[in-house]
UniProtKB/Swiss-Prot annotation:
Residue ranges, annotated region (Disordered): 439-470
Superkingdom per UniProt: Viruses
Organism: Acanthamoeba polyphaga mimivirus (APMV)
Name under which the protein is recorded: Uncharacterized protein L537
Ranges of compositional bias, category Basic residues: 443-463
Length: 470
């Protein structure tokens, strides 16, 4: 194909809106340096969704950058590209702030004081976000390196700060240039843990768990690019106008830039820290294999069990949340779940639109234990137990599936929702996916009546109290 024809063909690929990530990853573009971005869009359900745009190279994207005002860097590799698991240390800080005008009117704070303020409704306390916030973060990063790493040149680190113009929250991104991890997911997770430990020992105005958003570090993670806005939102802009877009990105897309960047590996971690904080080798290999699994057509790589085991394990999850995922690739003890439609996450109950998940299968003397994990890393728990398969007859057993009628119990347990409000009789509409207390009681009464007629023992279900602050 002549060069001009290739360019015309590639332009047609770039003009295509891919609504599925896998379609973008496997798009038939003629390049080995493909660059993919995620763009925001409004879905038919009036939610914020995404579509993907594919460029022959990062350089081609830069020329068209202004045409994509709501774009995100997304950590995926096109099927033509070599696998890349490296990336810089990044942070996403989001702190909800309070309108200070009321506090100024009451005289609680000075009228000329424009510091962002946090209001804690539980303790009824007011906390000002320190003016030297950025310096505190940078100092903590340096202190983390001093305590837990070696042979890292701190003098060449560059802190690339950007700020959202949203007046309702304190929102900043930070990319640490010259702290370039060979294994971005594993090393970033470790650094976050160590950073949080140092922070909590030194600063008390906010806890690290409320400060650091660790969910951006995951397979197929993404981060809003500097210069982009959310739909109907506010732009993210550089604090220092001398910084450039390539400085702020997780990955390094120019070879000459990559060769100059300071690379940090497992060998830079102090030995006593590795066993205490670093994930197991199995977890690391799983993270590394995720992208490889998704980018190739081979369905099964190094399976640990017979294919029927993976099928039966999937059937357990599908009985709980039908038609949310389809079976993806198999790699060892892991089965990837490919999302078909949005749904609340089995692990955290948070609503996910795009993230895939996985099942982990471990074998004991008599059973196969099935656990669910989410690639959004949306919960403190790594995985949630789903059920088991009995070896031999492969009978399915799950605490979330009724033995008699096959109905599911996960997320359908009796829920008493107690809103912490000034009025006990305040009317509050619960979300559609949460049963009201009245409907639960009614349903329970009908089941008891039916059970008494059939003279079968009544199954007692547990009641969970949830307290929601309003």
């Amino acid at each position: 194909m002549a060069e001009d024809k290739i360019e015309a063909y590639n332009k047609s690929i770039t003009r295509t809106k891919y609504f599925k990530m896998d379609d973008a990853i496997n798009s038939p573009i003629c390049s080995k340096t493909v660059f993919i971005i995620a763009n925001e869009r409004i879905t038919k359900e009036n939610r914020i969704g995404r579509y993907y745009t594919v460029f022959p190279s990062f350089k081609k994207f830069l020329k068209k950058r202004d045409s994509y005002p709501q774009c995100h860097e997304i950590i995926i590799d096109h099927i033509n590209n070599k696998t890349n698991i490296a990336g810089r240390l990044v942070f996403d800080f989001d702190i909800k702030i309070t309108d200070s005008s009321i506090l100024k009117d009451t005289g609680l704070i000075d009228k000329n004081d424009n510091q962002p303020i946090m209001f804690n409704s539980k303790t009824l306390s007011i906390t000002k976000i320190p003016l030297n916030f950025k310096q505190q973060i940078e100092n903590t990063i340096i202190e983390t390196i001093d305590q837990y790493f070696h042979d890292i040149d701190k003098t060449i680190l560059e802190f690339i700060w950007s700020t959202s113009q949203n007046p309702n929250k304190f929102s900043k991104h930070l990319t640490v240039k010259n702290l370039y991890f060979d294994d971005w997911i594993t090393m970033s997770k470790l650094f976050y843990k160590l950073f949080c430990k140092v922070w909590d020992n030194q600063y008390y105005w906010i806890s690290s768990k409320d400060l650091v958003d660790s969910q951006i570090v995951r397979n197929k993670g993404s981060l809003r690019m500097v210069g982009s806005t959310k739909i109907n939102g506010y732009p993210l802009v550089f604090d220092n106008k001398n910084h450039t877009l390539p400085d702020s990105l997780i990955r390094i897309y120019f070879r000459n830039h990559r060769e100059k960047e300071q690379l940090v590996t497992r060998n830079n971690i102090n030995k006593d820290i590795i066993n205490q904080f670093l994930e197991s080798n199995d977890d690391i290999e799983h993270h590394r294999s995720i992208d490889i699994i998704d980018r190739h057509f081979t369905k099964i790589r190094n399976p640990s069990y017979d294919p029927i085991i993976y099928q039966k394990a999937f059937e357990i999850y599908d009985a709980i949340h039908p038609n949310i995922f389809k079976m993806g690739k198999v790699n060892g003890k892991y089965l990837t779940l490919i999302r078909l439609k949005p749904h609340t996450c089995f692990l955290s109950n948070k609503f996910h639109e795009q993230e895939n998940a996985y099942l982990y299968i471990s074998m004991s003397d008599t059973t196969y234990k099935i656990s669910f994990g989410c690639y959004r890393f949306c919960s403190k728990k790594k995985m949630e137990y789903l059920g088991s398969l009995i070896q031999g007859n492969l009978m399915k057993n799950s605490p979330y599936i009724d033995d008699t009628d096959g109905t599911t119990k996960k997320h359908d347990f009796n829920i008493n929702i107690k809103f912490l409000s000034d009025s006990d009789d305040e009317s509050i509409n619960a979300p559609n996916n949460i049963k009201s207390l009245e409907s639960i009681k009614s349903s329970k009464s009908k089941k008891q009546l039916k059970s008494s007629k059939s003279k079968k023992p009544i199954k007692h279900t547990k009641t969970k109290n949830i307290y929601v602050e309003t």
